[in-house]
Design a protein with these regions (language model features):
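Extracellular glycan-interacting surfaces
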Residues: 4-426
Length: 426
């Protein structure tokens, strides 16, 4: 039953792909990050529009704005109006975060890039919104503290950096640091240390753009966790009240972090940063770059898939590996390169002969009857790799479609499309 519910969560996570229909396709090509884009420049441009007479953005102005908005319905005497939701009900939006409660697998918590936190206690049959109207709704990552006695604690990161608009990749959503719940997801508050309320005008807060957040289940004495943001990977030992930069410090745009059940940390930074590559650490402080020499020089966002039945095996699925990996033609007359590698840790720090790599990129679905049938991560906008807990050869990869391989993508003959566009769409 536990395995079934785990797979149900995986299936729900893939629903963002399932409901896509090609009759009126959205052009996501404009979402792709181009070299001229700069979050820092956009931040300064926004600041010029929002400065007060003294040349400052008033402290906590966004929070005050939302609080003021709460009073508007009362002032307009609309409190007696009754509203009924009329739909649509079959559109999940951009769900960046989803997890089930380890103490009750019927309880699911999901987070949307512009829709806030939602909670279900009946395995997704119905949902309740937990984010308050005066809070920012830009949820991008979510994690639960699974240590005994700590399961009521959850964290989520904020800020959609990949773009949340069908018409422009520059339309990213700023977040406001990290949020924490101590009542199993029923209510949430910001961790004030890293909110952007006190930012100087035009300043850039990397904690406004979180890619992923994970906790160390083995550290019983400290609240140890890791956060992947724009620019780098951060570590905390006090529940994200303070953070230290472990890798990065430059302009790496797409970054990720995952952790094994034994506390081994894997991180990835895109090629536009100084500390680019794939990294491994046994303690979160000493890091080794384990990236294979033949990987290629250009790469964007990477999804990390740890094999639960053998955590020495990790899959890395990377988007926009220009001139390296698998080439595919995509809809809207586009084209892309994607790479899939499998890493096996053997000894020591995992580098050189202490780790082996297998390039599985040639088995990524390509050259299908129509471009909608080919693998397409849309520049990393949608990217997923997961391993089935009790069958390590069953591996899932997701882009605009969701694919299932029964031989770990060691061939292209044992792969089936299980979600996304209707096969044969044109």
């Amino acid at each position: 039953m536990k395995l079934f519910k785990l797979l149900t969560v995986l299936t729900l996570f893939g629903l963002a792909f399932v409901m896509i229909r090609p009759e009126q396709p959205i052009d996501f090509n404009s979402i792709y990050k181009v070299p001229s884009e700069s979050p820092k420049s956009r931040k300064k441009w926004d600041a010029k529009r929002l400065l007060d007479a003294n040349g400052n953005i008033p402290q906590s102005i966004r929070r005050k704005e939302l609080k003021f908005a709460q009073s508007l319905p009362n002032d307009l005497n609309n409190s007696n109006l009754l509203w009924t939701a009329e739909g649509p009900y079959n559109v999940g939006g951009r769900t960046r975060a989803l997890a089930y409660d380890v103490t009750d697998e019927n309880t699911l918590i999901a987070g949307g890039a512009s829709g806030g936190i939602w909670r279900s206690t009946n395995l997704g049959q119905s949902w309740s919104k937990m984010t308050k109207p005066f809070q920012l709704h830009n949820v991008t990552c979510l994690t639960q503290d699974t240590r005994p006695g700590k399961e009521n604690i959850w964290y989520y990161g904020t800020g959609e950096l990949a773009g949340n608009s069908a018409s422009g990749g520059g339309a990213y959503f700023d977040g406001n640091g990290i949020y924490k719940s101590i009542d199993n997801g029923l209510s949430w508050d910001t961790i004030s240390s890293f909110t952007s309320d006190n930012n100087a005008a035009g300043s850039f807060n990397v904690f406004d753009f979180a890619w992923n957040i994970v906790l160390d289940p083995t550290n019983l004495d400290e609240d140890e966790g890791y956060l992947a943001t724009y620019g780098g990977i951060y570590r905390s030992i006090d529940g994200f009240n303070t953070l230290s930069l472990e890798i990065g410090g430059g302009d790496a745009y797409y970054n990720n972090v995952e952790i094994t059940s034994t506390g081994v940390v894997y991180a990835t930074l895109s090629s536009d940063g100084a500390d680019k590559g794939f990294w491994r650490s046994a303690d979160g402080m000493e890091w080794a770059n384990i990236m294979p020499d033949s990987f290629g020089n250009t790469y964007g966002r990477t999804a990390i898939g740890i094999n639960p039945s053998d955590e020495n095996e990790i899959y890395f699925l990377t988007a926009e590996t220009t001139n390296s990996g698998q080439f595919t033609n995509t809809f809207f007359n586009g084209e892309t390169w994607t790479s899939l590698w499998k890493y096996t840790y053997l000894c020591g720090d995992g580098t050189d002969s202490c780790g082996t790599w297998v390039n599985l990129s040639q088995n990524i679905p390509a050259n299908r009857p129509t471009t909608f049938d080919n693998f397409n991560a849309q520049g990393g906008y949608d990217l997923l790799v997961k391993v089935k807990p009790d069958e390590p050869n069953v591996v899932f990869i997701g882009g605009t479609n969701l694919w299932r391989s029964t031989d770990g993508f060691t061939s292209d003959t044992n792969t089936a499309q299980i979600g996304g566009y209707y096969e044969g769409s044109d």
